[in-house]
């Protein structure tokens, strides 16, 4: 699909950058020779806009071998960022898709500044091409296939091999994020814990990873009472899924991802209202993020050891379901008083984290659609983070900044630990109350990380979008897929 060339050839569409202070850039001047000065007139008349994310279409009318030019406004260079570029190109690729363009090119060097080099631009362009044109996988009987971009050429004076490599990495990042989106959007009667495990196994086999899928009997032998408690009410068997990627000869320095895999959450006996239950098919967004990251890792093969653990079940009501006031024993041996069956994700993660440590994880990053509290605190565009290790958090933060996936650190104080340890009947309670809800959930999970360096990522607000946006349609976003993969890539380079 991707090509790199030094000269512009015949294309249906060519994408060109426009900065506010460079209306007469060398790229525009060169094109304007064929247009006999008409582009400059359009700029002066403001029919070609330099405003951020403005897209101006100009037909060549046979003056060049290119049918149409799409000029992308990027605003002032001083405020130009990777986020600006991602949004602008996302909107551009949506526009190209709507116009049924199959062969497009980008004047890559027109997007290059002192802040962003050609490799950065190539990576982002290939990544965003996939993200911006992602389509929901529906179950409608009258599906209509859209015309898709078949050929995309980067026009640049830079080294072709380096640009091709950047295009490949960007494409893989975008494709894997879309894989995660598709998982999150799937209905719960289709994506059960069993089906999620089958997907994970297929992924592992494709990329020659080791894997384990623990069945209920094996979980009982290992004492995974927290995950098993959540599963008690279900007719669907639980799964503890583990993917093992060996990027080094020695099994050391292992990053452990733990993704919440609750395939549907009714709240259990602490039942959600209808409004709160619809959409809970997406409560396995953490699992999807982890699997998306493992797809990238499998494709790009970084020199880093990684484990991905996914505790998976649904949380439903029945005569056998667990109840408020139950006391359960986790795999770690710690006992938990259940005060809220709708705080089930942290129970599943407790056993998931303990299992990841058993498999050799030296660093832990858990990802979960965990609390409504994080949405109240940070909204729908920022993932909440908590940690017991500032050095590891800084590495996660740097990866998130590189991918433009915003995260914000929430605190853990001793008084928070006291609240989750406040139980007359057990070592911990799973829901100390509404106050500081997001912090309480993260603090509870930290009790199982113990001294292992750990970062918690609550994607309840960022896992899905209520409306269409520059990087995709309404629905799942694939939050944290690219951040997790970038973290591993950076670890592997050290």
Swiss-Prot record:
- One of the record's GO cellular component terms: cytoplasm
Cofactor(s) required, per the database record? Mn(2+)
- Active site per database record: 272, 346
Q: What is its EC number?
A: 3.4.11.1, 3.4.11.10
| Biological process annotations from GO | proteolysis
Molecular function terms, GO-annotated = manganese ion binding; metalloaminopeptidase activity
In which residues is Mn(2+) 2 bound? 260, 265, 283, 344
Q: How is the cofactor bound?
A: Binds 2 manganese ions per subunit.
Per UniProt, subcellular location reads as: Cytoplasm
Q: Which reaction does it catalyse?
A: Release of an N-terminal amino acid, Xaa-|-Yaa-, in which Xaa is preferably Leu, but may be other amino acids including Pro although not Arg or Lys, and Yaa may be Pro. Amino acid amides and methyl esters are also readily hydrolyzed, but rates on arylamides are exceedingly low; Release of an N-terminal amino acid, preferentially leucine, but not glutamic or aspartic acids
PANTHER family for the chain? CYTOSOL AMINOPEPTIDASE, LEUCINE AMINOPEPTIDASE-RELATED
Per its database record, what is this protein's job? Presumably involved in the processing and regular turnover of intracellular proteins. Catalyzes the removal of unsubstituted N-terminal amino acids from various peptides.
Member of which family?
Belongs to the peptidase M17 family.
Q: Record's HAMAP family?
A: Cytosol_peptidase_M17
Q: What is this protein called?
A: Probable cytosol aminopeptidase
Source organism phylogeny: Bacteria, Bacillati, Bacillota, Bacilli, Bacillales
């Amino acid at each position: 699909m991707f090509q790199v060339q030094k000269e512009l050839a015949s294309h249906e569409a060519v994408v060109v950058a426009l900065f506010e202070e460079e209306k007469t850039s060398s790229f525009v001047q060169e094109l304007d020779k064929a247009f006999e000065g008409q582009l400059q007139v359009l700029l002066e008349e403001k029919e070609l806009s330099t405003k951020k994310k403005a897209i101006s279409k100009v037909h060549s009318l046979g003056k060049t071998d290119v049918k149409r030019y799409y000029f992308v406004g990027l605003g002032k260079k001083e405020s130009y960022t990777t986020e600006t570029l991602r949004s602008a190109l996302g909107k551009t690729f949506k526009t190209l898709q709507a116009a049924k363009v199959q062969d497009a090119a980008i004047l890559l060097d027109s997007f290059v500044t002192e802040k962003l080099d050609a490799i950065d631009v190539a990576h982002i362009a290939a990544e965003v091409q996939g993200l911006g044109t992602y389509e929901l996988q529906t179950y409608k009987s009258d599906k209509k296939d859209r015309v898709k971009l078949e050929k995309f050429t980067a026009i640049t004076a830079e080294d072709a091999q380096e640009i091709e490599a950047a295009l490949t990495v960007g494409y893989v990042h975008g494709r894997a994020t879309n894989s995660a989106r598709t998982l999150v959007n799937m209905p719960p009667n289709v994506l059960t814990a069993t089906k999620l495990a089958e997907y994970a196994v297929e992924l592992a086999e494709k990329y020659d990873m080791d894997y384990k899928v623990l069945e209920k009997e094996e979980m009982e032998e290992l004492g995974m009472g927290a995950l098993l408690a959540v599963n008690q009410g279900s007719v669907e068997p639980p799964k503890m899924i583990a993917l093992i990627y060996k990027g080094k000869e020695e099994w050391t320095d292992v990053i452990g991802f733990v993704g919440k895999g609750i395939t549907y959450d009714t709240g259990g006996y602490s039942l959600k209202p209808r409004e709160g239950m619809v959409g809970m098919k997406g409560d396995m967004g953490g699992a999807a993020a982890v699997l998306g990251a493992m797809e990238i890792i499998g494709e790009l093969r970084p020199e880093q050891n990684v484990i991905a653990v996914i505790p998976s079940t649904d949380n439903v009501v029945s005569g056998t379901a667990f109840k408020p006031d139950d006391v359960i024993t986790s795999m770690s041996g710690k006992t938990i008083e259940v005060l809220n069956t709708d705080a089930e994700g942290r129970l599943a993660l407790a056993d998931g984290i303990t299992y990841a440590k058993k498999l050799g994880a030296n660093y832990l990053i858990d990802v979960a659609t965990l609390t409504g509290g994080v949405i109240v605190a940070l909204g729908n565009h920022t993932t909440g983070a908590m940690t017991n290790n500032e050095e590891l958090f800084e590495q996660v933060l740097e990866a998130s900044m590189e991918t433009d996936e915003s995260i914000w650190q929430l605190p853990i104080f001793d008084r928070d630990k006291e609240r989750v340890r406040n139980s007359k009947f057990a070592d911990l309670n799973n829901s100390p109350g509404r106050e500081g809800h997001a912090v309480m959930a993260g603090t509870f999970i930290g009790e199982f990380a113990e001294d292992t360096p750990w970062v918690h990522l609550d994607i309840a607000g960022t896992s899905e979008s209520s409306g269409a946006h520059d990087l995709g349609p309404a629905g799942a976003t694939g939050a944290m897929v690219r951040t997790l993969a970038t973290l591993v890539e950076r670890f592997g380079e050290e």
